[in-house]
Curated annotation (Swiss-Prot):
Region ranges (Disordered): 408-508, 907-951
EC number: 3.1.13.-
Homology family: Belongs to the 5'-3' exonuclease family. XRN2/RAT1 subfamily.
Biased composition, class Basic and acidic residues, residue ranges: 920-938
Composition skew (Basic residues), residue ranges: 416-426
Role: Possesses 5'->3' exoribonuclease activity. May promote the termination of transcription by RNA polymerase II. During transcription termination, cleavage at the polyadenylation site liberates a 5' fragment which is subsequently processed to form the mature mRNA and a 3' fragment which remains attached to the elongating polymerase. The processive degradation of this 3' fragment by this protein may promote termination of transcription. Binds to RNA polymerase II (RNAp II) transcription termination R-loops formed by G-rich pause sites.
Source species: Mus musculus (Mouse)
Name assigned to this protein: 5'-3' exoribonuclease 2
């Protein structure tokens, strides 16, 4: 999930890190879809080596999208996932590795957050279903129109959790998908593909980071590998910085707020379930042929360049006159660590640090002021120096009281402005709004009479008569609004607002008033603030959490069992004496098994994904762990406005009690359930042209059961071990499609094998530093001393990945195409929206015309109706431009001169006009062929040139 609002804050503070993706769309010819050839150079002017997919960020929007109707069944969900991966692949076009990672069993520290999310999702889903049924009954009772309710099972997104049948089926589908692409897509032919499905323990993004860390530790690793990671979580940014790779890019879908969402009752856009009135759907198109079209556009992708973010951070964190050598890599690690205080997936954020209030900037300023006293950096390769952190936190604690007061002042000021705004709107709005056919509308609005009603007044009158005749409940004093809904003939009386402001949630802590610390501990922890021992325990747990999270980001999971046992965080002023606290963790811990994790994170409403005897433990009143599964629970808004921002007060799961209860039901598992309950590993795939393919086939021929080292020279330096896969995909064996609508692979040439990353000792420390031989990318940001050192040269900003990329130019054929397809103006032969090419146009992409003018009609034949060249010229070409008084006739066109001197060539199938044979823009205030006055030029003629001869 990451840190809420972190990406928005980051992209606003450091805008140059964002680059829009250039995406080549598939083409369609005669009804046949032509896929994108990903083997061609990347249109983004950059070549990526490795692409990593955090698959859960793909699975969720494909299975239950928010901006379009959901897939009808599981098969459609799988196809949607395949298409989404194809889009990403065609944008990034990796040349070495594709790594797909699905969330497996998470550490215990993450399970608390997963448990909260799933309980919330179940509760909100049940409430939404009840509300939907209530509104449906009300609408039908009033005679409203609703489409028949489909009898289908509601998709429970909680099934996207390791151990469920859905995730097991997804792994099978992805195996088929990879084999299909390796067989048929030229962009995949030399690619190494690794799939880490839900059976492999660990979160998806951390499995990716663990792979990168272990490969970087190998002596033959390429330090200039260009990585691209796909995911929308904000913590991916910090994980990417933690790798210290010079070439690291994140691709994510661009967030666009206020996307239209269809109503769950009538499937129409523009309102929610609570506002649904059951009105008939407006016909789209003459014959309703556009009924299935959606008003939402396909999402766009953006690149986030971490190398540019590193430049920003280097500028911001650079400090002079330090008592120790400045190291930008260490300072970036400290910045990542400070971001943990404003929130992460494992710890609640400190009450005084809100990212929307500039908490990170405040921490950085305090860090730069205090670092001279600390004597060094806060972190080193994932380990925290608590003595130095204590100095930072106590400095934050000194300003906590002023932070709370300023927050209250800002909130009060915002409420006053909103109240004044509502008063102005109420004062400016008329109390009486006319309606009906003659309703006045603003000019140019979509609902104006000229756009809808007046376009066919007879049809509107007919519909009104039919509506009145067929609806006895509608009185004669009723008219119809532009959307077809009945409204009083005289108009609509606007309802007075019930209140000037929304009710504010009750806040018993009141952090802005004296005594805030005592009230906080009493309300949140139910203890007295004077209980120093308890406060020390809370701070100790939070400090352990900070150390655990940093080590998780830089070294891997320090303990699978540790978790923060409270719902709330302490204050920064409570961090006194943390230098003496221990930050060691129990070694040798193991992750939960998949079904055990389901029991720890699922509510009873999602028990259908568990074996029968297991789910009984969730609902049986006599169950020893029934208290883990409350049917309802409180949500503490904790000073926030919306429920999703609040804290779900769920009981923590006691691991010992849970395991003891499960021991009694373990014998009830079937062989299939036992298989799904086991932990798995990664699988590597290659195609027939990959150098590693023959080596893998030899392993299957020998039947060796011992792990074999991967030859790095055959797969771009990747190291690890191979072991035979019991469910292997092998050549000359049919790969059956798990999706009925997709074909089987009868001539398979791909091969798969189990893969394991290089192993290290438990106390091994991965160095958080840039590798020797790594080359930093060219600087993107404008140097601070540019004005002094540039000798008057103008700074040229870099808009994409390549500073030397050529600007986009259109050749003469493209301009002619625009001239043909652009709507024409009225009254004269002009293209109203076509800009003239510049007279000195010399595009880098210029190419001379094909030999023989007879080829031009063939070239344009796919853009014009058939045989359009044989008929008389269109009206806009029959019009003759008026020549200036005394002007001489034009000389004939000289191809040789044109080819030598011009990037544009006259088109003999069009009239002569401006440069390149293009007519000028229409100008009603001027006459003459080039916009000159009709009485002729007022200045001497220009000298003759080889390009045009006007005489």
């Amino acid at each position: 999930m990451g840190v809420p609002a972190f990406f928005r804050w980051l992209s606003r503070k450091y805008p140059s890190i964002i680059v829009n993706c250039v995406e080549e769309k598939p083409k369609e010819c005669n009804g046949v879809k032509i896929p994108v050839d990903a083997s061609k150079p990347n249109p983004n002017d950059v070549e990526f080596d490795n692409l990593y997919l955090d698959m859960n960020g793909i699975i969720h929007p494909c299975t239950h999208p928010e901006d379009k109707p959901a897939p009808k069944n599981e098969d459609e969900m799988m196809v949607a996932i395949f298409e989404y991966i194809d889009r990403l692949f065609n944008i990034v076009r990796p040349r070495r590795l594709l790594y797909m990672a699905i969330d497996g069993v998470a550490p215990r520290a993450k399970m608390n957050q997963q448990r909260s999310r799933r309980f919330r999702a179940s509760k909100e889903g049940m409430e939404a279903a009840v509300e939907k049924q209530r509104v449906r009954e009300e609408i039908l009772a009033k005679g409203g129109f609703l489409p028949p309710e489909e009898i289908k099972e509601r998709f429970d997104s909680n099934c996207i959790t390791p151990g469920t049948e859905f995730m097991d089926n997804l792994a099978k589908c992805l195996r088929y998908y990879i084999a299909d692409r390796l067989n048929n897509d030229p962009g995949w032919k030399n690619l190494t593909v690794i799939l880490s499905d839900a059976s492999a323990p660990g979160e998806g993004e951390h499995k990716i980071m663990d792979y990168i860390r272990r490969q970087r530790a190998q002596p033959n690793h390429d330090p200039n590998t260009h990585h691209c990671l796909c995911g929308a979580d904000a913590d991916l940014i910090m994980l990417g910085l933690a790798t210290h790779e010079p070439n690291f890019t994140i691709i994510r879908e661009e967030f666009k707020p206020n996307k239209p969402k269809p109503c769950a009752l009538c499937n129409q856009f523009g309102h929610e379930v609570k506002d649904c009135e059951g009105l008939p759907r407006e016909k789209k198109g003459k014959h309703d042929e556009l009924a299935d079209s959606l008003p939402c556009a396909e999402g766009e992708f953006i690149f986030l360049r971490l190398n540019v973010l590193r430049e920003y951070l280097e500028r911001e964190l650079t400090m002079a006159s330090l008592p120790f050598p400045f190291d930008v890599e260490r300072s970036i690690d400290d910045w990542v660590f400070m971001c943990f205080f404003v929130g992460n997936d494992f710890l609640p954020h400190l009450p005084s640090l809100e990212i929307r209030e500039g908490a990170i900037d405040r921490l950085v300023n305090i860090y730069k002021n205090v670092v001279h006293k600390t004597g060094g950096y806060l972190t080193e390769s994932g380990y925290v120096n608590l003595q130095r952190v204590q100095m930072i936190m106590l400095a934050v604690g000194e300003v906590e009281d002023s932070i709370f007061k300023k927050r209250k002042d800002d909130e009060d000021s915002f409420r006053r402005r909103q109240k004044e705004k509502r008063k102005r709107m109420k004062r400016d709005q008329p109390a009486f709004t006319p309606s009906g056919i003659l309703t006045p509308h603003a000019l140019g609005s979509r609902n104006s009479p000229g756009c809808q009603v007046a376009s066919n007044p007879r049809q509107a009158a007919y519909e009104m008569r039919m509506q009145r005749n067929s609806s006895p409940s509608i009185s004669p004093n009723t008219s119809f609004a532009s959307d077809g809904s009945p409204s009083p003939l005289g108009g609509i009386k606007r309802k007075a607002e019930d209140s000037d402001s929304e009710p504010e949630p009750e806040d018993n802590v009141r952090l802005w008033e004296a005594g805030w610390k005592q009230r906080y501990y009493k309300n949140k922890f139910d203890v007295d603030a004077a209980d120093e021992k308890f406060r020390r325990k809370v701070v100790q747990s939070y400090v352990e959490g900070l150390c655990w999270v940093l080590r998780y980001y830089y070294q891997g999971c320090a303990s699978w069992k540790w978790y923060y046992p409270f719902h709330y965080a302490p204050f920064a002023s409570d961090f006194e004496g943390i230098a003496d606290m221990s930050s060691e963790f129990e070694k040798g811990t193991k992750p939960f098994k998949p079904l055990e994790q389901l029991m720890g994170v699922f509510p009873a409403a999602s028990g259908n994904f568990l074996p029968p005897t297991w789910r009984k433990l969730m609902s049986d009143p006599d169950s020893s762990i029934i208290d883990f599964y409350p049917e309802d629970f409180a949500i503490d808004l904790n000073g926030k406005k919306y429920a999703w921002q609040g804290v779900a007060l769920l009981p923590f799961v006691d691991e010992r009690r849970l395991r003891a209860a499960l021991e009694e039901v373990y014998p009830d598992l079937t062989p299939e359930e036992n298989r799904r309950n086991s932990l798995g590993g990664d699988v590597l795939f290659v195609g027939k042209l990959h150098p590693l393919r023959d080596f893998i086939l030899e392993l299957y021929q020998t039947g060796s059961t011992e792990p074999v080292d991967v030859p790095p020279e055959l797969c771009h330096g990747i190291q690890g071990t191979f072991s035979l896969d019991e469910e292997a995909i092998l050549p000359d064996q049919t790969v059956c499609s798990p999706v009925p609508m997709l074909r089987d692979l009868t001539q398979n040439t791909a091969v798969s094998i189990n893969f394991k990353d290089p192993q290290f000792a438990e106390d091994y420390v991965f160095k958080a530093a840039m590798l020797p031989g790594a080359r930093k990318p060219a600087t993107v940001l404008k140097p601070g001393d540019w004005e002094k050192s540039s000798n008057g040269r103008q700074w040229k900003p870099q808009l994409g990945f390549n500073r030397d990329r050529r600007p986009v130019h259109l050749d003469q054929a493209a301009f002619r195409t625009l001239g043909h397809v652009t709507p024409r103006g009225s009254g004269t032969s002009v293209y109203t929206n076509t800009a003239l090419p510049p007279a000195n146009y010399q595009g880098n992409n210029y190419r001379p015309l094909l030999r023989g003018q007879a080829q031009i009609p063939k070239l344009m034949s796919n853009m014009r109706p058939q045989d359009s060249w044989r008929g008389p010229p269109p009206l806009f070409q029959q019009h003759r431009f008026e020549r200036s008084v005394g002007a001489e006739p034009l000389l004939p066109w000289n191809r040789m001169i044109q080819n030598q001197n011009a990037a544009f060539q006259p088109n003999q199938y069009q009239m002569l006009g401006g440069p390149g044979g293009y007519p000028p823009r229409r100008d009603d205030h001027r006459g003459g062929r080039q916009g000159y006055p009709r009485e002729g030029r007022k200045y001497p003629l220009p000298p003759p040139s080889g390009r045009y001869s006007w005489n």
